[in-house]
Swiss-Prot record:
It comes from the Bacteria. One of the primary rRNA binding proteins. Required for association of the 30S and 50S subunits to form the 70S ribosome, for tRNA binding and peptide bond formation. It has been suggested to have peptidyltransferase activity; this is somewhat controversial. Makes several contacts with the 16S rRNA in the 70S ribosome. GO terms for molecular function: rRNA binding; structural constituent of ribosome; transferase activity. NCBIfam families: rplB_bact (TIGR01171). Pfam families: Ribosomal_L2, Ribosomal_L2_C. Belongs to the universal ribosomal protein uL2 family. Part of the 50S ribosomal subunit. Forms a bridge to the 30S subunit in the 70S ribosome. SUPFAM superfamilies: Nucleic acid-binding proteins, Translation proteins SH3-like domain. GO terms for cellular component: large ribosomal subunit. GO terms for biological process: cytoplasmic translation. This is Large ribosomal subunit protein uL2.
Length: 276
């Protein structure tokens, strides 16, 4: 879909660039596939902020998207494409032959009336879901499971895709958009194609209020805080304290690695930030 620009009738519209969503469904979502969603405002059960810069925003209904795609060998027809406020990608409403409705992440080039299916012998076309062992090497994929039958966890946001680059002793080798090369069990499912809405990255909000509608609160620099709030806080005038940049919790930022190792690191063949 194309991008929309606007006449500068106000300062908030001068730089505004949005994705044209005129081809999407304009009505309400399917009621049986939606549920209420309460805003946490970045707080935990003690009421303390655990995630900064969250709060406010427009109320949303949660669309129950099927990330497992476990209805094997039952064709489904794409009824319509919809906007989903809870994610950057568009979603597709599909109807199985037995009448059941479901939402899935819409890949690029998926049109209304197309047929999608989950099958080990499915055609290699956008929207079809197959085990990694059944997908040809070199295929562009998204919606990738990390554990069999757990549901897709990787490559779900707008415009993203990964590439199957090899298979070896029960594992598939997948190259992610970040440049990381990692192994996943070849019994895990993945969907063919790249995720819809690739122009999302080119949107320009143009005003603070548009981010507030999305539930994003301002980011305050540590150097303008008090010493009790941040390691960079305090001092007379615009002083930074003379230390290297750190997070509010004292961890070094802007360069040094602070990530802890995980058991699954052994599945990463090449790190995303490895020098090529």
């Amino acid at each position: 879909m194309a991008l929309k620009t606007f006449n500068p009738t106000s300062p908030g519209r001068r730089q505004l660039v949005l994705v044209d969503r005129s081809a999407l469904h304009k009505g309400k979502p399917v009621k049986a596939l939606t549920q209420g969603l309460s805003s946490k405002g970045g707080r935990n059960n003690q009421g303390r902020i655990t995630v900064r810069h969250q709060g406010g925003g427009v109320k949303r209904l949660y669309r129950q998207v099927d990330f497992k795609r476990t209805r094997w060998d039952i064709p489904a027809t794409v009824e319509r494409l919809e906007y989903d406020p809870n994610r950057t990608a568009f979603i597709a409403l599909i109807k199985y032959q037995d009448g059941e409705l479901s939402y899935i992440i819409a890949p690029q080039r998926l049109e209304v009336g197309d047929t999608v299916i989950t099958s080990a012998t499915a055609d290699i076309k956008p929207g079809n879901t197959l085990p990694l062992k059944s997908i040809p090497v070199g295929t562009i994929i998204h919606n990738i499971e990390l554990k069999p039958q757990k549901g897709a966890q990787m490559v779900r946001s707008a415009g993203t895709y990964a590439q199957l680059v090899g298979r070896d002793s029960g594992y598939a080798q997948i190259k992610l958009a970040s440049g990381e090369l990692r192994m996943v069990l070849d019994s895990c499912l993945a969907t063919i194609g790249a995720v819809s809405n690739p122009d999302k990255m080119n949107e320009v909000s143009s005003k603070a209020g548009r981010n507030r509608h999305l539930g994003k609160r301002p980011t305050v620099r540590g150097v303008v805080m008090n010493p009790v709030d941040h390691p960079h806080g305090g001092g007379e005038g615009k002083s930074s304290g003379g230390r290297h940049p750190v997070s509010p919790w004292g961890k070094k930022t802007r360069g040094p690695k602070t990530r802890n190792n995980k058991v699954t690191d052994r599945l990463i063949i090449r790190r995303r930030n490895a020098k090529r």
